[in-house]
């Protein structure tokens, strides 16, 4: 069954062939189109810069992103991981787009205590794609728990989305071709399982 996939690509090297992340994005898109999925791509660094979130009302740019997300079955957000978070442009995108009451509402129980109720994105799928420069064991055992769990709290805990991960380790400029191809095959398999 054909699905609509919204991709928010957060890397300053977004042109084809310019980065490992761009290769992941392009492989994902090529495989998705072969299967018959529809792609809605934004390159965050190629878009008008989003203002820092200030708690105010969303502007037309944010409302457009939200409309496109509502029309999609799957959202994929891609970014390298720097200092235990996604890069600042991607984090700012998340902070501005996934806010209440659009993404979730709060059910008040007592005073300031309550819980989130998913809204516009409930039961959609979120694929979180992050790349790390460090080795798999160190990051998977210790460090990557921080960004992975925070994003899961946002997309699953608050927004009610089903979360899947696409993680890559030891993403360095001198990556051997064999490892690169192994990563691209992982991307293709992820798309085939959607």
List the predicted regions and their residue ranges.
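Short hydrophobic segments within beta-strands
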Residues: 8-10, 42, 129-131
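A structural preference for short, hydrophobic beta-strand core positions in alpha/beta folds
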Residues: 40-43, 165-167
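A short, flexible beta-alpha/helix-coil linker loop
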Residues: 11-14, 47, 132-137, 170-174
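Glycine-rich phosphate/pyrophosphate-binding loop and the adjoining helix
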Residues: 137-194
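N-terminal beta-loop-helix "entrance" segment that forms/cooperates
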Residues: 41-60, 178
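N-terminal beta1-alpha1 ligand-phosphate binding loop
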Residues: 2-35
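Helix-loop-strand module that forms the ligand-binding subsite of alpha/beta enzymes
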Residues: 57-152
């Amino acid at each position: 069954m054909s699905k609509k996939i919204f991709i928010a690509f957060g890397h300053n090297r977004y042109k084809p062939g310019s980065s490992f992340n761009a290769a992941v994005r392009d492989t994902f898109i090529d495989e998705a189109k072969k299967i018959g999925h529809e792609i809605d791509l934004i390159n965050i660094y190629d878009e008008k810069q989003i203002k820092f979130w200030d708690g105010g009302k969303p502007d037309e740019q944010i409302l457009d992103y939200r409309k496109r997300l509502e029309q999609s079955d799957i959202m994929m957000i891609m970014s390298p991981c720097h200092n235990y978070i996604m890069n600042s442009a991607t984090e700012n995108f998340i902070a501005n787009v996934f806010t209440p009451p659009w993404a979730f509402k709060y059910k008040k129980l007592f005073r300031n205590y309550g819980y989130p109720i998913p809204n516009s994105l409930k039961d959609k799928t979120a694929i979180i794609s992050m790349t790390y420069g460090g080795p798999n064991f160190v990051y998977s055992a210790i460090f990557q728990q921080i960004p992975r769990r925070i994003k899961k709290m946002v997309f699953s805990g608050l927004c009610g989305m089903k979360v899947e991960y696409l993680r890559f380790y030891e993403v360095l400029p001198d990556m051997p071709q064999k490892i690169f191809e192994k990563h691209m095959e992982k991307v293709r398999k992820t798309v085939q399982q959607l």
